[in-house]
Amino acid sequence: MPSVNIDLQAHPNLQFRIDCFTVPAASRPDFEAAMHRNLAFIETLQGFEGHVVFEKTAGPSAFDVVTIGVWESPEAVAAAGEKVRAHYQSIGFDMPAMLARWGVTAALGFYNAPPAMQ
């Protein structure tokens, strides 16, 4: 079970990768397998603090899976992005094409937690 401790006062530069997905039931096993493979690689990267996956249980949102990855700083995110792109290229993985093939829709982005908004 993942553990993520978010102490914004002690770590004000934390960066959050929040990805929201709508996953057709028929594609769910392939999607989950790819998600686990991706996480196994990301966990090896410097500055990665943790990851949590949420599954919708109620409400009007179109998204049924939400993932949140926590990074120690904007610099860690930038370095990780380069390594992830290189890794995907080395294994011939095309994320947008794979999501399209599975019929998955996604909203992806990086976020911070501005102190003035807390």
Predicted regions and their residues:
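Short, well-ordered beta-strand segments in beta-rich or mixed alpha/beta enzyme
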Residues: Q15-T22, H51-V84
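Short glycine/proline-enriched loop/turn "hinge" motifs that connect secondary-structure elements
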Residues: D7-H11, A58-G59
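An amphipathic, aromatic/His-enriched active-site/gating alpha helix that lines ligand/cofactor pockets
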Residues: P2-S3, Q9-A10, R37-E49, V70-L108, ...
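Short acidic/polar alpha-helix capping motifs at helix-coil junctions
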Residues: P2-N5, R17, D30
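Short amphipathic
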Residues: I18-C20, T105-N112
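Short, surface-exposed ligand-recognition loops at beta-strand->loop->(often short) alpha-helix junctions
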Residues: T22-A34
